[in-house]
Structure formats: C-alpha cells, structure tokens
Swiss-Prot record:
GO CC terms in record: cytosol
Subcellular location: Cytoplasm
Entry keyword annotation includes ATP-binding: no
Cofactors required: FAD
Enzyme class: oxidoreductase
Effect of L186F: In strain: CWL029 and TW-183
Principal localisation: cytoplasm
Protein name: UDP-N-acetylenolpyruvoylglucosamine reductase
Annotated GO MF terms: FAD binding; UDP-N-acetylmuramate dehydrogenase activity
Keyword check for Cell membrane: no
Homology family: Belongs to the MurB family.
Top-level taxonomy: Bacteria, Pseudomonadati, Chlamydiota, Chlamydiia, Chlamydiales
UniProt keywords, alphabetically: Cell cycle, Cell division, Cell shape, Cell wall biogenesis/degradation, Cytoplasm, FAD, Flavoprotein, NADP, Oxidoreductase, Peptidoglycan synthesis
Function per UniProt: Cell wall formation.
C-alpha cells in the first residue's frame, strides 16, 4: 500500500516520533506528527489549526497512567513542555501543567507550604494530576485546587472553578471534554512540613509499589470499600506474566514492563484480570487511559 503523502503544517513538526520514549510504561510506536509545546501562544496556534482541519490530536505530559499502542498514534501528539510555578499571596501557588507533580510537592514543602505532601512519588505532570484528580488514600488534588486555566479546541483561553472541574475519584470533566490544561492555582497553608513525613510517604510507596520499574501506575480503579490490588492478589494472579508484561509481584494492581512488553501483552493481562474477577461478581474498571492507534476525532485524551 502506498504511504500517504505527509501533511503540511504552518509550524515546525517532527514526524514518526516513538511514543515509548514519552511513556513511563516504555511502550508505544510512532506518532504520525509530534510537537513539543513550550508557550501558551504556541499551544493556542497548534490547537486552533488542528481543530480547523478536524485532525485528531493527543495531549501528553509525563506519559504516566496511559498505554500507547505498539503501532503508535495515527494523529498528532502535543507534548506539554509548559513548565514553571509562581508563589502568590495567601499561600496560593500557580503551577503550569507540564511541571512534574512530584517536583511541585517537593518544592512547596521546601518553601514552607503544606498541602501537597501526598504528591511525593506520584508520577506525571500537574496537568495529568488535574486530568485524573491524582491522589492517594490520604488526599487528592481536589482538596487544594481552586482554579484551572485551559485552552479549548478553538484555541480560546478558559477558566474553571473547582466546582466546575467535576472532580471525583480519578476523574474530571476533561475525560469527556478535550481541552489543553494550562495551569492550576492551588490553595496551600503556610506551615513547615516535616521532611521526615514526606520521606515516609515516599518510602512507603517505594516499599509497596514497583516504583523503579516501567509501569503506568495503578491499572484499575479501586471498587468502593476495597482495593483492586488485594482482589487481584486473592484471585492468585500476582506475578502472572505474558511475554514482557507481568502483574507486579510487589503490588497486584500494577502491570510492569520487564523488558520488551507490548501493548497487546498488557491488554491480555488486563483482560485476564477482568474476566477472572468477573466470575466472582466483581467488575474492575481500568484507571489507565488505553490510547488507540486510530483515535476518534476530538475524543478525550490523556494529559498525564
């Protein structure tokens, strides 16, 4: 089959960029087109143009909590490289979406602010944290966010209050409404955080999760009142492997890439887990975003 002629854009782009380099899973084939976004105006220009030609695009940050297809992405990938933070009055901070969420938690604690201790060790960007309402059993970002600025599909700047974000367990309005999350204003408290407390949170994560191995984080949402990891472990699936993909022997709600895992191998493990738990009357919903090779136009996208 003859390869389609390359498209022409009114801005510089890269072609056939492998997404495994931009994934904490280290899985994913090439994107048709790829562009790192460094400024607000750049984001507006690119999004406005892609929307005008009805071309599918995907927004990524640190590449956590998502699984790219081995074939890649048959569209345009925008890599969020808008970094930075501003300390405001009354213990508020404005954080730009490309910034590492864990790094933000560390920086705020260092500067004498409390409220983001739970961010220690959480992979992903600030934009991804908003997109997924990231958190732990202790807290999540909904407890501190006050306002979020975005760029909609027409390239317009938008602003949402915390009530308008529709934040719930690992979810937000952006799961159904495609927008480029630009920044978040967080309300913290001026209180010196114990370094030991932050270290203990991170140490617990290191001891209980495969933090140093390629993964996308927790695969499934926790059913109400219980833990997906415990259910998978009790079903005898911990450690099960298909090819280079393995249900983590350390935490059963993680699938790790032991070397050369493919997206199909990961999806096979996900299907086995779901079908096994289904026989026990338990429906597990996956928390990670499974990004198809051929996307639907203007479908919800990953921001992590």
């Amino acid at each position: 089959m003859k390869e389609a002629a390359p498209m022409h854009f009114p801005f510089p782009v890269r072609r056939s960029v492998w997404l495994n380099r931009y994934s904490t899973f280290r899985i994913g084939g090439p994107a048709n087109y790829f562009k790192a976004i460094h400024t607000i105006e750049e984001a507006r220009e690119v999004i406005r143009f892609l929307h005008s030609i009805n071309y599918p695009f995907l927004i990524i940050g640190k590449g956590s909590n998502c699984l790219f297809d081995d074939r890649g992405f048959d569209g345009f990938v925008l890599y969020n490289a808008i970094y930075g933070k501003q300390f405001l009055e009354d213990a508020r901070i404005k954080a730009y979406s490309g910034l590492s969420f864990a790094a933000l938690g560390k920086a705020t604690a260092y500067n004498g602010y409390s409220g983001l201790e739970f961010a220690a060790g959480i992979p992903g960007s600030v934009g991804g944290a908003i997109f997924m309402n990231a958190g732990t059993n202790e807290s999540d970002i909904s407890s501190v966010v006050r306002n979020v600025e975005t760029i909609n599909s027409e390239g317009e700047l938008c602003s949402y209050s915390v009530e308008e974000l529709e934040l719930s367990y690992r979810s937000s309005r952006f799961h159904r409404q495609q927008e480029f999350i630009l920044s978040a204003t967080l309300q913290l408290s001026k209180k010196q955080v114990s370094a030991d407390h932050s270290k203990s949170i991170l140490q617990h994560r290191l001891m209980t999760q495969p933090y140093t191995q390629p993964s996308a984080g927790c695969i499934f949402r926790n059913p109400e009142g219980t833990s997906a990891g415990k259910l998978i472990d009790a079903a005898g699936l911990k450690g099960l492997a298909i090819g280079g993909a393995q249900i983590s022997p350390l935490h059963a709600n993680f699938i790790i890439n032991t070397g050369k895992a493919t997206s199909d191998e990961v999806k096979q493990l996900i299907a086995i887990i779901q079908s096994t738990l289904k026989t026990q009357g338990i429906d597990l919903e996956h928390e990670i975003r499974i990004i198809p090779y051929q996307p639907k136009i203007h479908s919800p996208v990953s921001e992590k």
